[in-house]
């Protein structure tokens, strides 16, 4: 099978599992005991209007707050930085020489790495000016 990456935009607010149960957001037949009722999570509303509840840990791993332009810049900087670190490690490890055969593509990868670094610096400057 092939790999796919998907992203979706949602609305969410903090909510306990007990509150989610009271609002009918849990799976039918799922009744939390007193301990689980206190468990923190999020009330989630999808673009198609479907609403559900998600435990905090998987929600916070999958979603990042993107309410303001500053939030979105910080997400962009974090994502680009992650890709930059991987590319720089690939280039510096010598694996690039094993995988990429021609000098032109090696040069393009190095230019891409430099451009990503410059873009991260630009985003960081904009973020600092927005604080």
What is the meaning of each model-derived region?
Residues 93-107:
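Acidic interhelical loop/turn segments
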């Amino acid at each position: 099978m092939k790999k796919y990456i998907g992203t979706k935009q949602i609305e969410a607010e903090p909510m306990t599992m007990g509150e989610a149960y009271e609002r009918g957001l849990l799976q039918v037949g799922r009744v939390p005991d007193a301990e689980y009722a206190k468990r923190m999570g999020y009330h989630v509303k999808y673009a198609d209007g479907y609403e559900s509840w998600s435990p905090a840990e998987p929600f916070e791993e999958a979603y990042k707050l993107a309410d303001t332009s500053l939030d979105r810049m910080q997400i962009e900087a974090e994502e680009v930085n992650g890709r930059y670190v991987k590319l720089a490690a690939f280039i510096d490890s010598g694996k690039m020489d094993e995988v990429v055969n021609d000098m032109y593509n090696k040069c393009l990868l190095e230019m891409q790495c430099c451009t990503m670094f410059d873009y991260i610096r630009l985003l960081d400057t904009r973020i600092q000016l927005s604080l």
